Amino acid sequence: MTSRQQNLWKTKATALDCYRWHLLRERHSLLGSIVRFFRDAVADCCFGFLAKQRLAHQIVTTPCDFLLLQSAPRIIALRRKKALIAALQELGYRLTETALPEHREILAKRLLSPPPGKTPLRYYGYAAHAAWIVARYQPRILLNDRNGSFYSPFLRLSLHQHRSTLVHLAHATTVESSRRLGMNDYDYYFLFGPSSLAALQKRKLRFGSSMAVLTGSHMIDQSYDLPPPDLTIRTVLILGVGPDREKETGFQRTYALLKEWAARTPHYQVLVKRHPRSAVPFWQEAADSLNNVSVLPKELTLAQALERACCVVNIMSNAVIEAGLAGRPVLYCNLSNDRDIFAQEAFFGPALRTLEEFQSRIKEIEADFPAEIEKARRFAFFHLAHGSQGLNKTCQALEYLLSGKALPNDIESVALSETI
């Protein structure tokens, strides 16, 4: 390795310090940023120091074509990428799924290998674990899941030593304001569609460069090509929010409004599709007291849930995009102060905040049902490239990259440069 290549790790570490400083300054005062920067640096240096003492004595290799690196072990249990895993395995590829452990586990199990390049102490632990992952699995393509991970830059550097590729798979649209979405240090960044690309391009702070690829969603397949809904079934599907949001006052008020509407409208059946991480205690209690409210089983897929509904109520769930793709008219109901990150108001009107507004929107949908179906589909294609072909297009793009070919002409790709 040349001295220039050796210095890549040091250069990357310096750039990461700069990026993390800018992230802090976006939210905190100068003094607050200084305190937090040095607090984080001390924690990282401790991890780096201990990592140097806990390098693996030997590494048993299990080479694969694709390594799917999830953000945490608990994410594997949610099986969000089961369709992608099955599709790639059916094509005959060797795919291994693993997750980023906590620092304590990395140190205890010696999941560390010396980084190929000179790395400052602060980032030694990150670089050493990234080097261990690449040495252990020897993937031809690493599929990364975790937004904002400080492992990503060092995974990319280590992979390049083996002429391998880092692909980041967006697991939702990238239209939200999360600071983690400033991380852009990947070879390829597979995005849902045009709205995601536009949102990333507008960001003032991006670390690293990538090739953004509009593959569509790898979680969407032809199961969302549903027949037009039947208005006469009078069934509304509520898309639940995550457990963290369920604790917030604005979302609790939204749930209460929807429950009150259900109580006053017994001729409509109300189905609740829970967030994968939520036990939906509010709706479980509502289902016990209201005959027209049901919480759907966890194992029921989103496509199966949508098939049972004539329209969908969304608050702040990414699943509204699949609802639109399935041609289900949308009622955007939200009593929180959160920004409408999905641009629902542009398609479905202002957020519904009262019973009167909600009932008026129901009547609007009933009055011109075919037009509302088309409006929902236009909304979906605003966010999704390739519609229900997202899984197929993702697999196709990965096959092309694996074979060293240029991406197909019908899959748009755009260079996404760094800003610092």
Regions found by a protein language model. Give the residues of each.
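C-terminal amphipathic helix plus adjacent low-complexity
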Residues: T2-L23, R361, E366-I420
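Donor nucleotide-activated moiety binding/catalytic core segment of transferases
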Residues: H129, R277-A326
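Short, conserved active-site loop motifs that form the nucleotide-linked donor/cofactor pocket
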Residues: A212, N292-S294, G349
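Conserved catalytic-core segment of nucleotide-activated headgroup transferases in glycan assembly
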Residues: A77-R80, H218-A286
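Catalytic binding pocket for nucleotide-activated donors in carbohydrate/polymer assembly enzymes
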Residues: Y186, F207, L214, N318-A385
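Hydrophobic/aromatic beta-strand patches that form the interior of the parallel beta-sheet core
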Residues: T96, L143, V167, Y188-F190, ...
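Active-site and donor-binding regions of nucleotide-sugar-utilizing enzymes
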Residues: M1-L24, F38-I220
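Short, charged, surface-exposed secondary-structure boundary motifs
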Residues: I106-A108, E176-L181, A199-R203, Q222-L226, ...
